[in-house]
């Protein structure tokens, strides 16, 4: 059976020193290498914010809060209005300001907006995180800051929002943008492959 060659886009290529260190660890101990890779896997990357998103920060009220469910500090953004209440949840390696066009349109039409930078993302305090933690955070926000008439979410944030609703969080509407249906094991195997290591 022919082995399929996987090409990695330039912006996903990892620094040589990181891949080299992972390979040395893998040679010494598979267990150590796995723990090292898992730690990196759960660590969001903070990308540079483009200038087009600057207006989002000018228009929102910002508050760093202590999220009890995850014991971490996270950044909340709000545009108070008298209309229906919407919560925005971004995807992995994302940030709230990526919703700037949708948020501007909705707030101009009277919607009350709340957006969250997930743990380790955007302007929240740098930290590792994972799906169960983000699910707990969305549930906490719906209880402590809600109720919300709708939750708008992207990719990984959609998976967390679906899980939180499944576990009792309430909202009238759930809007999923490019929802990911993730199984962690295949995702982690692909991630390990980026280091040039045996995915098994």
Language-model features, listed with the residues they occupy:
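Active-site glycine-rich loops that stabilize anionic/oxyanionic intermediates
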Residues: 83, 91-94
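Alpha/beta-hydrolase active-site loop
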Residues: 127-150
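Short beta-strand-to-loop junctions in surface cap/lid or active-site-entrance loops
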Residues: 74-84
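Hydrolase active-site cap/lid region
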Residues: 169-200
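Gly/Ala-rich beta-loop-alpha elbow adjacent to hydrolase catalytic centers
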Residues: 152-161
């Amino acid at each position: 059976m022919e082995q399929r060659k996987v090409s990695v886009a330039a912006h996903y290529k990892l620094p040589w020193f990181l891949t080299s260190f992972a390979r040395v660890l893998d040679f010494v101990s598979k267990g150590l290498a796995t723990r090292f890779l898992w730690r990196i896997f759960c660590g969001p990357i903070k990308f540079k914010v483009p200038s087009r998103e600057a207006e989002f920060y000018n228009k929102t009220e910002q508050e760093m809060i202590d999220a009890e469910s995850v014991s971490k500090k996270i950044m909340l953004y709000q545009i108070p209005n008298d209309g229906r209440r919407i919560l925005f949840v971004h995807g992995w390696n994302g940030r709230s300001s990526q919703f700037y066009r949708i948020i501007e349109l909705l707030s101009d039409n009277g919607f009350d907006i709340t957006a969250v930078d997930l743990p380790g993302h955007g302007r929240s305090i740098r930290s590792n995180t994972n799906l169960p933690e983000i699910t707990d955070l969305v549930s906490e926000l719906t209880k402590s800051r809600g109720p919300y008439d709708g939750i708008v979410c992207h990719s990984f944030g959609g998976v967390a929002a679906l899980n939180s609703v499944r576990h009792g969080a309430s909202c009238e509407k759930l809007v999923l943008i490019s929802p990911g249906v993730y199984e962690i094991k295949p995702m982690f195997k692909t991630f390990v492959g980026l280091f040039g290591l045996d995915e098994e």
